[in-house]
Amino acid sequence: MAEYDLTTKIAHFLDRHLVFPLLEFLSVKEIYNEKELLQGKLDLLSDTNMVDFAMDVYKNLYSDEIPHALREKRTTVVAQLKQLQAETEPIVKMFEDPETTRQMQSTRDGRMLFDYLAEKHGFRQEYLDTLYRYAKFQYECGNYSGAAEYLYFFRVLVPATDRNALSSLWGKLASEVLMQNWDAAMEDLTRLKETIDNNSVSSPLQSLQQRTWLIHWSLFVFFNHPKGRDNIIDLFLYQPQYLNAIQTMCPHILRYLTTAVITNKDVRKRRQVLKDLVKVIQQESYTYRDPITEFVECLYVNFDFDGAQKKLRECETVLVNDFFLVACLEDFIENARLFIFETFCRIHQCISIGMLADKLNMTPEEAERWIVNLIRNARLDAKLDSELGHVVMGNNAVSPYQQVIEKTKSLSFRSQMLAMNIEKKLNQSGRSEAPNWATQDSGFY
């Protein structure tokens, strides 16, 4: 369903290598014409050194012989790779030394490690540039494991002020994502975020751009790492600089934040967060909306249960065709039904099972079994009267203390949103090309 596909918007903020998995996914889903997707892959590959991959794509796209320019490029890439391997081999051998490995694991100070290598192995400053160039070349060739290894060596040796320090962090994160090493990718994501947040050299606009890129790159990690759906809420909703970036540069990210909230396994946290999420969705509804955000609006703003049920059916189509969200489908539908049920029950103290079945798009028998399971698993304070076919809700009285906490949180959040809106109006809105790590000489500027 191309209408709700965000691939083009998201790709604008990604390194070209990170776009390939998205195109492969679209190819399987058959949302777009296959030849258009192949041409898109070929265009992306033109600025990489993955020549063999480009040749395979060209063969699938065209029946004629592979262009001479591609064959020449392959010869050039192989020659460059051999030259860089020869230059880097002595450096790599230093890191293979067991004592060097021990020093790297025990020493947190890059300067001390550099001095140790200089004293024991004759390591020189220019070796860092050689190591960085080789790591980047490996990445351009699609050897992400090699790139990650050499970028790790580079990172532990260079100071934060090095001209390639920030660029190497982007490269390391991309490499781990493309190898699907989610624990390592989460560590790299955290390290990169800290670097961006503590960077006093970048202008406010540059920091905004960096955070926007980080938001998009983080989707790979957050929707694959076990703790991802908690972390995405904390980062996107409760860290003002990142919520501001979403509202200013990429409101389409609300789809992913909303899905993370709805599918979060912590029931208590999910209910608390929903109130804050609804406010953001309402505020940004004029800039972005899709069935997922509209489902929340229907249910929690308009209390339109028929509309919510209709949007839930549309959500299934959106989730199935979204690269990042396809694995969330089952959790989303289950929790969305629970939300409809809970909201409906807050309005009606006693509800017939038949009416509930209609609202949840189930048969009465399915609805009864579903409610029994909710009560059994302590997710619902209610009693079921099977003879009358009624569900009677329990009385969940909220203490005055809890009411004060909720009102204080609400005021704090509203103040935060007001401050962000003022900042948004004052800031000059600007967009930039995504950080294409593999094709930059140094950094992204």
UniProtKB/Swiss-Prot annotation:
Main location, first listed in the record: cytoplasm
Gene Ontology cellular-component terms listed: eukaryotic 43S preinitiation complex; eukaryotic 48S preinitiation complex; eukaryotic translation initiation factor 3 complex; eukaryotic translation initiation factor 3 complex, eIF3e; nucleus
Keywords: Cytoplasm, Initiation factor, Nucleus, Protein biosynthesis
GO MF terms, alphabetically ordered: translation initiation factor activity
Keyword set includes Nucleus: yes
Superkingdom field: Eukaryota
Subcellular location: Cytoplasm; Nucleus
Subunit comment: Component of the eukaryotic translation initiation factor 3 (eIF-3) complex, which is composed of 13 subunits: EIF3A, EIF3B, EIF3C, EIF3D, EIF3E, EIF3F, EIF3G, EIF3H, EIF3I, EIF3J, EIF3K, EIF3L and EIF3M.
Physiological role: Component of the eukaryotic translation initiation factor 3 (eIF-3) complex, which is involved in protein synthesis of a specialized repertoire of mRNAs and, together with other initiation factors, stimulates binding of mRNA and methionyl-tRNAi to the 40S ribosome. The eIF-3 complex specifically targets and initiates translation of a subset of mRNAs involved in cell proliferation.
UniProt name for this protein: Eukaryotic translation initiation factor 3 subunit E
Species for this entry: Gallus gallus (Chicken)
